[in-house]
Amino acid sequence: MTVEELKKKKIAVLMGGLSAEREVSLNSGKAVLASLVKQGFRAVGIDVGRDLPQRLAEEQVELAFIALHGRFGEDGSVQGLLELMGIPYTGSGVLASALAIDKIASKVIFASAGLKLAPYQVLRRGEELKLANPLPVVVKPSREGSSVGVGIVRDPSRMQAALDEAFRYDSEILIEGFIDGREVQVGILNGKALGAIEIIPKGEFYDYEAKYTDGGAQHILPARLPEAVYAEVLRQGEKAHAALGCDCYSRVDFLVTETGDCFLLEVNTLPGMTDLSLLPEIAGGAGIAFGELVLRILQAASLKI
């Protein structure tokens, strides 16, 4: 859609929601809403709850900019509702969203696409743990983002606590072999890589606090990688985005070793849009200001089914 066509439509920025990432989503949504209003769009913010269908109808929403993170927002739930209501929306569709947030399902697809993954095992609530990889390992819920519930276990005495924490958020968890590498994240827009940023967290890894606390991590743009490795991580980012059938934009997370191996961690279909978020920073490095990034995402809004 052209900018002129979009400015005639009532746009809702969907934010907040019911997940463990609610506060981050509110920050993303407020930033997007402020940008849209500044650019002259008829935009309103909606804090998503179980009354979302009624709110969308009452506001006579014609297009939705999804700024939700985590469950009930990034997992295909809201996307399915918008499809049923005939409201075009930003980001990926129902299936790609559901696959991306499910780390177990997405790993199967990534492996079939030839993408490199850390060795892992799946543990379901109630099952006995028979550790398949030597310590250290990374324990994480299957369907959460922003490193919620994630822990690194180096000592056997800490394993149960890490399992308990991950099971707080999901009935299925992943236990991955630890990869010693640089944390590198690739920004994707309209299916093409914008660039790659390197993250150096102040703590043990890039956890929730490091992601959303000013000064919690050092960002290096572009990532300090040899030219050939940098090109490869961009290519792998585009490949992962396409493998899940993602639409328009995403952020793809990797660990890159000293030998240049790029281990794929996950694809985020609704990456953060806050002042500390990485996709806007990567886009800025490619010459795309925040307002322009918001506009390009909005212009790609559509029904996917």
UniProtKB/Swiss-Prot annotation:
Listed GO MF terms: ATP binding; D-alanine-D-alanine ligase activity; metal ion binding
Cofactor: Mg(2+); Mn(2+)
Residues annotated to bind ATP: 134-185
Catalyzed chemical reaction(s): 2 D-alanine + ATP = D-alanyl-D-alanine + ADP + phosphate + H(+)
Pathway assignment: Cell wall biogenesis; peptidoglycan biosynthesis
Listed Gene3D superfamilies: 3.40.50.20, ATP-grasp fold, A domain (3.30.1490.20), ATP-grasp fold, B domain (3.30.470.20)
Co-factor note (free text): Binds 2 magnesium or manganese ions per subunit.
This enzyme's EC code(s): 6.3.2.4
Subcellular localization: Cytoplasm
Alphabetized PANTHER family for the sequence: D-ALANINE--D-ALANINE LIGASE (PTHR23132), D-ALANINE--D-ALANINE LIGASE B (PTHR23132:SF23)
Protein's job: Cell wall formation.
Descriptive protein name: D-alanine--D-alanine ligase
Species lineage: Bacteria, Pseudomonadati, Thermodesulfobacteriota, Desulfuromonadia, Geobacterales
